[in-house]
Amino acid sequence: MAMWQGAMDNRGFQRGSFSSFQNSSSDEDLMDIPATAMDFSMRDDVPPLDREVGEDKSYNGGGIGSSNRIMDFLEEPIPGVGTYDDFNTIDWVREKSRDRDRHREITNKSKESTWALIHSVSDAFSGWLLMLLIGLLSGSLAGLIDISAHWMTDLKEGICTGGFWFNHEHCCWNSEHVTFEERDKCPEWNSWSQLIISTDEGAFAYIVNYFMYVLWALLFAFLAVSLVKVFAPYACGSGIPEIKTILSGFIIRGYLGKWTLVIKTITLVLAVSSGLSLGKEGPLVHVACCCGNILCHCFNKYRKNEAKRREVLSAAAAAGVSVAFGAPIGGVLFSLEEVSYYFPLKTLWRSFFAALVAAFTLRSINPFGNSRLVLFYVEFHTPWHLFELVPFILLGIFGGLWGALFIRTNIAWCRKRKTTQLGKYPVIEVLVVTAITAILAFPNEYTRMSTSELISELFNDCGLLDSSKLCDYENRFNTSKGGELPDRPAGVGVYSAMWQLALTLILKIVITIFTFGMKIPSGLFIPSMAVGAIAGRLLGVGMEQLAYYHQEWTVFNSWCSQGADCITPGLYAMVGAAACLGGVTRMTVSLVVIMFELTGGLEYIVPLMAAAMTSKWVADALGREGIYDAHIRLNGYPFLEAKEEFAHKTLAMDVMKPRRNDPLLTVLTQDSMTVEDVETIISETTYSGFPVVVSRESQRLVGFVLRRDLIISIENARKKQDGVVSTSIIYFTEHSPPLPPYTPPTLKLRNILDLSPFTVTDLTPMEIVVDIFRKLGLRQCLVTHNGRLLGIITKKDVLKHIAQMANQDPDSILFN
């Protein structure tokens, strides 16, 4: 089968000669039919087809008609036919069929010549080469983002006089005047007060540093939101809800384009550096998918087939998580569990390869200078005990409650943003939230530091030489066996840190609600993990002190002896981080694997599993949707969730259009309509496709034709053949209809007709129809009764019906 020109290259074909085509109709409005009264008492003995296809003829068409005046312009591919308009859903069945035909043709030709064999081998290898390129580009961009964000975050507090391109840590690495206890202080690093007023002491110096911190934060946020607004509006947010929708078959032109990639990369650095409560991990998935989409254009196999391209995007999403967390296996599982709609075994292998290459590339760049892929990598050595499952489950309950609370409040705020004047002033909103965040963050060292550094500090297992306030314990021992420190009483620094962390927790919980969803790149992974890590560290320190002061208690004396290292507060922080992230996203398997890859400890999988499952159960009890599904519904994307069961006893006839007493279904006949008739129907309707029937009287179904293919084919015929006029007959049969002499040439369009559209009877239960739409990725399904066409069910009709059954607003299923 000939392959059509790739969808991404055909913006020009949106400019048809018909106004309705210029308006770029959505196939989700496919048959908002001005519908018809249905006569369900129609006779069963419908007369046979007017013209049966000859037994010795090919049913798929493409043959030459008997009349020498027949114009069949589809012997050669017409650019644009078989492609899709913006905000349309792809036809998964047709795309997979076209790829099988292409593969069959290449395989057959490979037996004919050496050159064809080489072409066959290169075609098979192209997928792996594409994965290699995606991994290299994603890893390189992630390294660039990490290094730039680290430097710009430190720029808010000062600058390195030994080289302005060094961040604080790198600046002091080569200094000869730094001590181990104060390794973050060196003469080469100057705060803004030292540069401006030559001193770092006193109230005025504090005010200068405070002012510069807020000023830099506002500047970075202003640049980020301005670049997004002017150059790439699609670069805002995390991108994961939209990527889920795109992977389900929806087309959003430009969302994964070159400008989006460039602006998202730049503004992600600016947004993270501004100190807002957001992360770069979610947007890195969007960046990786942009890389995958752009590189697809180098390979015809993927450029010209939307279904194959979505397999590549699934692998790119895995590479994005791989570089975000340094977790290649977790990335593959994230793509499978959270974002992918269609995930065949071949995609699993290629996703693994892309994630591996991306992680290796980032490791080679070594952005943090510690040979790790993430800033908060940590290793624990103390085993956990069975009793600790109780506080771990408590952290899971907290994570579920936080997740449900966050989703409800964030969605309410985002809905307010969409429905009020607030949404018209994205720059002001970003600047106000940034100013509030910066003003409240600077006085507290735990909110002033970047969120990744905060998580690293909370995960840290205190050693004897740690200078952090969280490790300010009273050392009441002489020796330390095996390098492990026993549980110790908390010092002044620990109590001070607890109060500061409690305030940090409150700020993070509140400010993240208003930050996620603003018109800047904003991920949710890191803020959610920070909330959980703070709660976990607070609980961990509490358990540690309880075990130290009350070792005689029954729950402790069986396993925690005097002078032993019983409780690891950093482990509680890690479990809390997993619980809160699971509560917000509802991830389970991939979340546990990502956290396991972060810590490198197999023995902590059980605590992580207990917390992740508890948080999911608690959050699901309070609301079924994760944050990404909630944003998909808020934006009205046509996404059919595969995880939800449809348990209602409705039938196809209850959902199809037209309903009883509605106008008749708009159809085309197979051989009796003129070009003018078809153009009139196209100009007067906005449907994205039309059923083709034998005749209006019989309503016997022949096939289904897409609006876009009709328009392009008719326009192409008018340009290339002088004989085609408005009175030319259009026919979809194998042979030309008998015509009187001196009639204008006919136009054969059988090759754009889908001869095997999916059909169900009017009495088919809707649970089966919903299952068909989910598993086959259909755009529409025709409804028949005894072989006669009754109506049509589109994907949007299914979504509206599901919303109606769930007592939600069915009109919210629109692309907003």
From Swiss-Prot:
Keywords: Antiport, ATP-binding, CBS domain, Cell membrane, Chloride, Endosome, Golgi apparatus, Ion transport, Membrane, Nucleotide-binding, Repeat, Transmembrane, Transmembrane helix, Transport, Ubl conjugation
Motif (Selectivity filter part_1): 237-241
Membrane topology: Multi-pass membrane protein
SUPFAM superfamilies xrefs: CBS-domain pair, Clc chloride channel
A molecular function (GO) term: voltage-gated chloride channel activity
Function description: Proton-coupled chloride transporter. Functions as antiport system and exchanges chloride ions against protons. Important for normal acidification of the endosome lumen. May play an important role in renal tubular function. The CLC channel family contains both chloride channels and proton-coupled anion transporters that exchange chloride or another anion for protons. The absence of conserved gating glutamate residues is typical for family members that function as channels.
Protein name: H(+)/Cl(-) exchange transporter 5
Gene designation: CLCN5
